[in-house]
A protein has these predicted regions:
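Short, structured active-site "lid" loops
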Residues: 77-95
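C-terminal binding/interaction regions
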Residues: 122-179
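C-terminal segment of N-terminal export signals and the immediately downstream linker at the start
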Residues: 22-38, 49
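Glycine-rich phosphate/diphosphate-binding loop of Rossmann-like nucleotide-binding domains
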Residues: 39, 43-55
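Alpha-helix C-terminal capping segments
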Residues: 84-89, 104-112, 128-132
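N-terminal secretory signal peptides and thylakoid transit peptides that target proteins
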Residues: 1-18
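Compact, glycine-rich, soluble single-domain proteins
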Residues: 95-118
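A short beta-strand-loop structural module common to alpha/beta enzyme folds
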Residues: 60-71
Length: 179
């Protein structure tokens, strides 16, 4: 393994993990798109900075709630964001809850939504490129504003691959939804 590749390799619990990401700064997204965002009470502190960032990048953002730290049920907010995506009013959606897990589960219950939980940039672009993900879920207790910025940049700059192997797989996911 070349020295640079070895330097970038990490080990977690003695097992080789993904290479460290490059130090490149997140870049504003190249194409502007309408987005829908929502959060529960646990995600509320991160939602405001995320909305400000997305608007600074030129996106239009529809805020589907919640609007305070008062407890709410995340499936209700997830449904609102998913409805925006499915109706075409948003090209992609973003959900923020405590860990992101509940939001991802809720999103994947909605036919036509492909949700992914992403706390790193590789997953954030790969899920769009290979799986045509249209709903990004993040955990406010897991990542802070800076990592969220990097994840959002990767997610929003990614495009679904034109390769037939990935398109075939996404079609199969659609068929599974019909069963």
């Amino acid at each position: 393994m070349p020295d640079e590749a070895m330097r970038r390799r990490r080990f977690l619990g003695g097992v080789a993990a993904a290479p460290l990401a490059s130090a490149a700064q997140p870049r504003p997204t190249e194409s502007k798109m309408p987005l829908a965002i929502g959060c529960d009470h646990a995600g509320f502190p991160l939602k405001g900075p995320v909305i400000a960032l997305l608007k600074s990048w030129g996106h239009t953002v529809r805020d589907c709630g919640t609007f305070s730290e008062d407890p709410v049920d995340f499936p209700d907010i997830a449904k609102k964001v998913c409805d925006e995506v499915l109706a075409g009013r948003a090209q992609r959606g973003i959900l923020v809850c405590g860990t992101g897990v509940g939001a991802c589960i809720a999103g994947n219950k909605v036919r036509g939504i492909r949700a992914a939980l992403c706390h790193d940039t590789y997953s954030a672009h790969q899920c769009v490129e290979h799986d045509d993900v249209n709903l990004l879920c993040m955990g406010a207790w897991i990542i802070g504003p800076k990592v969220a910025e990097e994840v959002l940049s990767a997610y929003l700059n990614a495009r679904f691959s034109t390769s037939e192997e990935f398109r075939r797989r996404v079609r199969k996911l659609g068929e599974m939804e019909k069963q």
